[in-house]
């Protein structure tokens, strides 16, 4: 009986894992996003100056590493002491990529800026998360307080930030990278423990 049950348990766990890889949840509230993740790391871009930067640009957010890339280069935007990350060309996207540390959650404040790097109100931004599957979300009328976050059941490959083709530049501020809340793995670990119990019983 237990011998025949073990393959069924393994199959159920594998099916659950396969199904979870396609699940990306969108958050538009930072507090809700942070409640769904663990060990967040932040990058506020305040070390950037208003100038052109080569692409890709290596960055860190807490213990996590990542790159920001754009075809025509990146641009440090912002005013005063509050600096942001943008692109050199308005139609170019920012691609956040090559995450380290098992990053499966990515969020931040996303809005539009002008040719001088100043804030443009009510821009429309399009963000796409890719973890093997893709999910696209449009921020309409984005402001400096427009938060968007993706939480995946799998590690993220890329997150892309672009405009809808308007005469403004895609801009990011205060991005946060994280891993899943430990409870995300609870059912899987419990299932694996059950497989271990089945194995021990079969050999006893």
PLM segments and residue spans:
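N-terminal signal peptide c-region/cleavage motif recognized by signal peptidases
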Residues: 17-19
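Short, charged juxtamembrane terminal tails flanking transmembrane helices
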Residues: 201-204
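A short, hydrophobic C-terminal helix/tail in secreted or cell-surface proteins
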Residues: 181-199
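Absolute protein N-terminus
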Residues: 1, 22-23
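Surface-exposed, well-ordered secondary-structure segments
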Residues: 23-178
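Bacterial N-terminal signal peptides that target proteins for export
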Residues: 1-8
């Amino acid at each position: 009986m237990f011998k025949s049950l073990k393959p069924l348990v393994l199959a159920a766990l594998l099916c659950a894992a396969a199904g979870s890889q396609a699940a990306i949840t969108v958050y538009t509230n930072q507090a809700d996003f942070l409640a769904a993740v663990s060990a967040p790391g932040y990058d506020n871009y305040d070390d950037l100056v208003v100038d052109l930067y080569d692409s890709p640009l290596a960055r860190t957010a807490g213990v996590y590493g990542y790159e920001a890339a754009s075809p025509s280069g990146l641009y440090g935007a912002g005013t005063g002491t509050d600096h942001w990350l943008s692109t050199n060309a308005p139609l170019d996207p920012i691609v956040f990529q090559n995450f380290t540390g098992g990053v499966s959650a990515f969020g931040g404040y996303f809005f539009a800026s002008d040719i001088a790097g100043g804030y443009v109100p009510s821009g429309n931004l399009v963000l796409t998360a890719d973890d093997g599957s893709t999910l696209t979300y449009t921020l309409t009328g984005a402001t400096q307080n427009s938060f968007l976050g993706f939480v995946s059941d799998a590690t993220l490959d890329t997150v892309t930030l672009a405009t809808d083709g308007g005469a403004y530049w895609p801009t990011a501020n205060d991005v946060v990278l994280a891993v899943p809340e430990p409870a995300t793995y609870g059912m899987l670990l419990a299932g694996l423990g059950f497989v271990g119990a089945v194995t021990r019983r079969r050999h006893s």
